[in-house]
Amino acid sequence: TNTWSAIKGQRALEVDWDHGEFHSWDSKKIKDMMENNSQNNAVVAKKVGNIKNDMSIESEYEVSFTSHATMEPMNCVIDVNKSSAELWVPTQEPQAIQSAISENLDIDIDKVKVHVTLMGGGFGRRFFYDGKFISDAIEIAKKVTKPVKLLWTREDDMKHDFYRPASMHKLKASLSNKNDLIAWQHRIISPSISGQLTPENFKKVELDRSAVSGASNLPYDIPNILVDYVMTNTNVPVGWWRSVYNSQNAFANEVFIDELAHRAGTDALEFRMNMLHDSPRHKEALRLAAEKAGWGKSLPKGQGMGLAVHESFGSWSAQVAQVTVSKNHEISIDKIVASVDCGTVINPDGVKAQMEGSIVYGLTSTLKGEITIEKGAVAQSNFHEFELLQMHEMPKVEIYIVPSLEPPGGAGEPGLPPVAPAVANAIFNATGKRIRKLPIRSKDLEV
């Protein structure tokens, strides 16, 4: 036997599928349902001061489902015996797998050995014990009583991922007569990853703290703030994805801040700096990125710069994107200058590599990667339908580390959240067209 023979056998099968109760479910119905749910009672995540109903500036933002799209599909090898089991698997959570196998097979946990192999990409995808492939391998191994290798095809993996949750963001704000930002409201409508995985923990408590990360800790000095959350089950499997909810919330926050700066007639960098008196690490990250990017320099027609800053996983990152938008609305990212304050740095090259990887991954989700639902199933199957950023599309990237003696923070995820808002703000600077939906398509610039 070999893998190709198994794949040919799979393709030869004629299966009569039960399409289930969600056969008529599609992306439009999901969007409509989320919009309707947005009017429901929301759970408050943060409230400061007094929020009134007469806020004059409003914007709405949307972020689509997206896949982890790991280069190596899900796979494992398992050997099950009467009193022991041995598993070889690329995973980010070996202890959970060990416990689950022990429970499934009713054998002592000390008799379960999990070998963590090298993995062709994780990004949160390999945090799940039961992505079905391991439990399927166990059931097969029970029956054949021989070691079993189970491999998902790319199509299997793309259609049965645990996707980054889609989300809607409704933001409102007020500026004073002096154009100071005096009130901010952010309502997040999104599925809960934790609520889907452990619904028993959310029977009475409907606030998923993870879902408001990056929103409830808004760094700006605003006297009146309300951040709330509407948990919305879309019936689509969702999971942790690189930077988790920070990628959605940073996009909404930093594009709206840019809109407010424009409304106030203030430079986008200056507008942010004026509201970061209590956030020196945000300020220094912004200052460094802006300085290295040459913020404020004159650019040819059709080119623009945009910036964003965000804190996540104990680190701060600011990014300045420079883009070109052609007369045909084709978008090219020319350069991204990023700063990162991740505390004490042990391996600078490692930090820079992680930041570069985050930017590549962030550009894919900003410009390309989108999962849509048709007839109750994922429409995309492989990289011809779920496109990744290609080598010729990769911009020049410069990474600058903020010197710090603070405790170390993360490096593998904080570089991703600022990517989308920096690019969206740069497109506005180049074209005057606001971007409020991810991923960004050329057709979004045609209206």
Identify the function of each model-found stretch.
Residues 1-447:
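Cofactor-binding beta-sheet edge motifs in enzyme active sites
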